Amino acid sequence: MNKGIIQLLALSLFCISVKAQDPWIIKADKIDPANYYGVTVANGMIGIVSSSEPFQVKNVVLAGAYDMYGRGRVSNFLNSFNLLNMYLLFNGDDWDASKVKNMKQELDMQHASFTTTFDYGDVASIKYTYYSLRQLPFCVLMDVSVTAKKTVNITAASVMQTPDALRDVQNYYNEVDGPTGRISLLTSTAKSPTGKLQLCASNAFIFNEADSLAPRLMHEMLDNNMHSMRFSKELAAGQTYSYSVVGSSITSAHTTDPLNEAERLTIFARLQGRDGLIKAHTKAWAELWKSDIQIDGEPQAQQDVHSMLYHLYSFSREGTAYAPSPMGLSGSGYNGHIFWDSDLWMFPALLVLHPEIAKSLIEYRYERLAAAKQNAFAHSFKGAMYPWESADNGTEETPVGSLSGPFEHHITACVALAAWNYYCVTQDKQWLQEKGWPIISACADFWASRVERNGPGQYDIKNVIAADEWAEGIDNDAFTNAAAKANLQCAALAAKVLNVKADPDWQLVAQNIPILKFPDGVTKEFASYKGGGIKQADVNLLAYPLKTITDPAQVKKDLEFYESRIPNEGTPAMTQAIFTLLYSRLGNGDKAYHFFKDAYEPNLNPPFRVIAETKGGTNPYFATGAGGIIQSLLMGFGGLDITPNGITQVKSTLPSNWKSITITGVGPEKKTYVVK
């Protein structure tokens, strides 16, 4: 390669870096449909995934809505009505995609909005922004502006489209008299594939004019699964005309009367007005961002970290009993099921920054405790055995072809430890007594019945799938055993806090569960492990989050052994986040930085730097990876530590190219921590 090409490439990389340095806004200045991975705007209930096509969104995902269809003979996430699609015609002519020029998009993470701009030939410039309204969990807003380049008649429509998987579609166009005039409602309802759920959505226009001066609306059936309401308007050259569409989407999983509730919610939002809706949404996100991670020294890392926080905040919300799937509300990846990803990887990050949101994730587990107890009973165990994959009712949802359902038992300990950590951070004894203790004690009972008692130090846990999921049918997996011990120990601690009698068998079992080692002192992943490649962190989780291994020399020995066992491709992003965290705590900031970058940069997809599960993967957004990386910043570089007495700070080391990291809004007291 000649010197000139090298210099040109270097200049290009510099320009890309400069463009990417805004801490809050990710811009896509060139839209390539062939290399486009949508980014999600969500409010913890409704997720809207962007599209490379003008006036389209890829799909709309609604938390808590599942039915049995599609993959695996198990429950799957349902795509909801696509209620934000639109069309815009000029002078009655058909839309001509070839006239779309200068199309740009941007995600504003600070305000949780997504904006598209483009020119339509020499006729008009268009800008639209949509929001998944944070203050209204079932509502969305689209804000549109059209600037005429010459005198033109526009026809604008809001389009309601039903996903193909839904059946028994019914479309309505209703008019309701409001306090200032008539409100027109574009409404659809349909059944889920088996008829289990009723899904409903409703839209209304918001005009800036007084209702008496607003454009006249017309209803139009476009297809059996698609209808619209439209208006026409004459614009003079240079004139800008703005309008909005507000909508709601809800199902019978959320309310007993979703059809009427969808229309009620749309009317409620419509009467708040466009400015009122955006103001309340912006205020809600400003409150969320009071808990932030600020990096001084690397603008691109700062933007990337904001993106991870943005997605974690977007995929969860206070006051629910929902937990995020590995892909959050970005689509139907992993069928929308809940795994240990929620409890071990996302929950701790949310717990430190927003305990009130984290509470929703553990509430999800509490409400499904009865199902976990039934699962334990069915497998001959006592207590509660949480399913590897969970959906709406807490029963096992793992497809039969995967053995993780009956054998990946460590998730039960992960749920219990999440409940204990919630108490540790909040110090809420009433919650611990009413909800935490039932979870923690039932999970401890499971482990006491799960072990095989083969003598002192040999309370074995046999025939499991490890956290390293390439290891199936193995005995005494390091993480499973250590997590079980931690569950039993925290149950005893919780009993002491509540002044209730702990089962003495818990401590006996905990003391006798083995953690195996090689002759050279390296912690052994499982009994028959010979040192081969592993899918993801297992042994290293004993140092964090379990704190089973605390000796720095042992932590380092295990790190150096297992970091060389992870293949460069095809493994999930969380592992490198744990390496980052542990190396930072060991004082090796530069090695921590290497793994920090390796945890996500090879996984990014254009144009919004969305994270896939694996290096080179194309299945964003991987919220599990984001949760792990945020933990590496909070508990690694930031040195935060969850203890029975609350959040404390331990010694940590920053990368040499970072000046400082500031973590704001930590814990219930909303403290600030700084590391320089």
UniProtKB/Swiss-Prot annotation:
A biological-process GO annotation: carbohydrate metabolic process
Signal peptide bounds: 1-20
Presence of the UniProt keyword RNA-binding in the record: no
EC numbers: 3.2.1.216
Thermal dependence summary for this entry: Optimum temperature is 30 degrees Celsius.
pH dependence: Optimum pH is 4-5.5.
Active site: E469 (proton donor), E613 (proton acceptor)
Source organism superkingdom: Bacteria
InterPro entries: 6-hairpin_glycosidase_sf (IPR008928), 6hp_glycosidase-like_sf (IPR012341), Gal_mutarotase_sf_dom (IPR011013), Glyco_hydro_65_M (IPR005195), Glyco_hydro_65_N (IPR005196), Glyco_hydro_65_N_sf (IPR037018)
Record key words, sorted: Carbohydrate metabolism, Glycosidase, Hydrolase, Signal
One Pfam family recorded for the sequence: Glyco_hydro_65N
GO molecular function: carbohydrate binding; glycosyltransferase activity; hydrolase activity, hydrolyzing O-glycosyl compounds
Signal keyword on record: yes
Reaction(s) catalysed by this chain's protein: kojibiose + H2O = beta-D-glucose + D-glucose
Similarity remark: Belongs to the glycosyl hydrolase 65 family.
Function comment: Glycosidase that specifically hydrolyzes kojibiose to beta-glucose and glucose. Besides its activity on kojibiose, is also able to act on alpha-1,2-oligoglucans with a higher degree of polymerization. Shows weak activity on nigerose, but is not capable of breaking down trehalose, maltose, isomaltose, sucrose, isomaltulose, turanose or melezitose.
Name by which UniProt lists this protein: Kojibiose hydrolase
Phylogenetic classification of the source organism: Bacteria, Pseudomonadati, Bacteroidota, Sphingobacteriia, Sphingobacteriales
